Amino acid sequence: MNENLFASFITPTIVGIPIVILIIMTPYIIFPSPTRLINNRLTSLQQWLVQLILKQLMSIHNTKGRTWSLMLISLILFIGSTNLLGLLPHSFTPTTQLSMNLGMAIPLWAATVIKGFRHKTKASLAHFLPQGTPIPLIPMLVIIETISLFIQPMALAVRLTANITAGHLLMHLIGGATLVLTSISPATASITFIILTLLTILEFAVALIQAYVFTLLVSLYLHDNT
């Protein structure tokens, strides 16, 4: 019986009960809040990384935008940790599910848009009609800008889903080819194993980059509306 390539993306269950919630909570179990008065090296490294990420994300924001710092740092840590945990053998990556990514993207995008219309109504409406637009093109440009606005959360979710899913499929295919070639051609199997190792290293980088890109785009949407 042939193995389904997409079997690893099916939501795992125990006695018919989905365990996605347990998987999502795993990063919080692995990285608990420090309770010591003096931090150890691991905690100090984590805090340094958090401060570095905050500096990169919050440098473009004003006072109102910086109130989202906790939300943005939680978002990037959550996506990054779930992506990395999904690279472990026999594990499940929640960010390969489009429904989950849409569940993150739509509320965050909607919050930034509502915030913009609430505090900067004229500036938000001005985005639908660029300055200097010829009068005959006004209706068409308004429609195009409206569509592009509503596509933003879909683009966020699809980008994350596609990149993570594609990487897992490539690793699955190359890993399967390596196992098959082991008994047929050990020399070729060693080459595919080296490729698999390099691809795994690349996927670790992609897991972190996609978390940063997702959070950075949310930060840019927030900057446009504050």
From Swiss-Prot:
The chain crosses the membrane at residues 5-25, 68-88, 97-117, 138-158, 164-184, 189-209. It is a multi-pass membrane protein. Keywords: ATP synthesis, CF(0), Hydrogen ion transport, Ion transport, Membrane, Mitochondrion, Mitochondrion inner membrane, Transmembrane, Transmembrane helix, Transport. InterPro entries: ATP_synth_F0_asu (IPR000568), ATP_synth_F0_asu_AS (IPR023011), ATP_synth_F0_asu_bact/mt (IPR045083), F0_ATP_A_sf (IPR035908). Its main location: mitochondrion. Belongs to the ATPase A chain family. This is ATP synthase F(0) complex subunit a. Component of the ATP synthase complex composed at least of ATP5F1A/subunit alpha, ATP5F1B/subunit beta, ATP5MC1/subunit c (homooctomer), MT-ATP6/subunit a, MT-ATP8/subunit 8, ATP5ME/subunit e, ATP5MF/subunit f, ATP5MG/subunit g, ATP5MK/subunit k, ATP5MJ/subunit j, ATP5F1C/subunit gamma, ATP5F1D/subunit delta, ATP5F1E/subunit epsilon, ATP5PF/subunit F6, ATP5PB/subunit b, ATP5PD/subunit d, ATP5PO/subunit OSCP. Subunit a, of the mitochondrial membrane ATP synthase complex (F(1)F(0) ATP synthase or Complex V) that produces ATP from ADP in the presence of a proton gradient across the membrane which is generated by electron transport complexes of the respiratory chain. ATP synthase complex consist of a soluble F(1) head domain - the catalytic core - and a membrane F(1) domain - the membrane proton channel. These two domains are linked by a central stalk rotating inside the F(1) region and a stationary peripheral stalk. It catalyses: H(+)(in) = H(+)(out). One of its GO terms (cellular component) is mitochondrial inner membrane. It is found in: Mitochondrion inner membrane. SUPFAM superfamilies: F1F0 ATP synthase subunit A. GO terms for molecular function: proton channel activity; proton-transporting ATP synthase activity, rotational mechanism. One of its GO terms (biological process) is proton motive force-driven ATP synthesis.
